């Protein structure tokens, strides 16, 4: 039968291995897979960390935010049972390159915020509450920018027309304005983190990081995305392979040799 977007397919192909480009499948025939031909659980990629554990870690991290305005902002936006919170917990973090699966945005945002929290204790002069809040919310626009059809992830109309940074900024800004007495300096600080987290104008940010907190979130976010690409690449390697083929996200190949048994496991 005719295959639908995001639905499993059965592929008949010829395998070959090119010295330069690596493993290749030349597709001969493709059709929609029948329900008895696949296990949905095997096709549903997800985070390596159990979902319930991530939710517990999220609650614990929000609980460490001392500023009452910032904690209320996080609780309003990310609480379970709210429209924004439920979408944020379920959304993917990307279309292809890293955490491109259900709950991927939660996984990515939480890991960035945890990294920011740890680094804030190392470097002086950083407002930890602002940095952690900005880290948890920096990609919140992706709940509108991406849409999922079955297993397929693509940009929504809003994502194409406006972009995830403006979508996220205005969602957070509206919530800050709805909190009575929310300080204008905190509004500026958190908003700046969201607007600048891509780091450069040519990478899609309307401004570059101008505060310690924004710079920290940008660099940890970039690190998280890069390491997420390594995870994605490694999953696609055959047993025993150490080198990947060229990967666009890394602008090169990835190497997975000389690893300790504990890490390899």
Question: Where are each of the predicted segments found?
Answer:
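N-terminal intrinsically disordered, cationic/polar leader segments
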Residues: 218, 235-236, 240-265
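Acidic/His-rich, divalent-metal-binding segments that scaffold phosphate/diphosphate chemistry
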Residues: 37-161
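Divalent metal-coordination and catalytic microenvironments
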Residues: 6, 112, 221
């Amino acid at each position: 039968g005719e295959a639908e977007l995001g639905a499993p397919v059965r592929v008949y192909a010829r395998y070959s291995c090119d010295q330069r480009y690596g493993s290749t499948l030349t597709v001969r025939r493709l059709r929609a897979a029948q329900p008895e031909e696949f296990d949905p659980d095997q096709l549903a990629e997800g985070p390596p960390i159990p979902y319930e554990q991530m939710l517990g870690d999220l609650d614990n991290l929000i609980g460490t935010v001392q500023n009452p305005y910032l904690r209320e902002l996080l609780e309003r936006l990310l609480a379970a049972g709210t429209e924004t919170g439920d979408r944020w917990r379920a959304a993917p973090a990307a279309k292809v390159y890293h955490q491109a699966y259900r709950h991927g945005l939660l996984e990515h945002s939480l890991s960035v915020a945890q990294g920011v929290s740890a680094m804030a204790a190392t470097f002086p002069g950083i407002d930890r509450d602002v940095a952690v809040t900005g880290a948890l919310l920096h990609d919140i626009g992706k709940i509108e920018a991406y849409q999922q059809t079955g297993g397929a992830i693509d940009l929504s109309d809003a994502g194409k027309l406006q972009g995830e940074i403006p979508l996220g900024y205005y969602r957070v800004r509206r919530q800050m304005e709805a909190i009575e007495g929310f300080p204008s300096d905190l509004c500026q600080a958190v908003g700046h983190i969201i607007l600048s987290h891509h780091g450069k104008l040519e990478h899609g940010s309307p401004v570059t990081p101008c505060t310690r907190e924004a710079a920290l979130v940008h660099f940890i976010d970039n690190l998280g995305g890069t390491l997420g690409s390594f995870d994605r690449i490694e999953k696609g390697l055959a047993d025993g392979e150490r080198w990947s083929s060229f990967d666009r996200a890394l602008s090169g190949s990835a190497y997975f040799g000389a690893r300790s048994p504990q890490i390899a496991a």
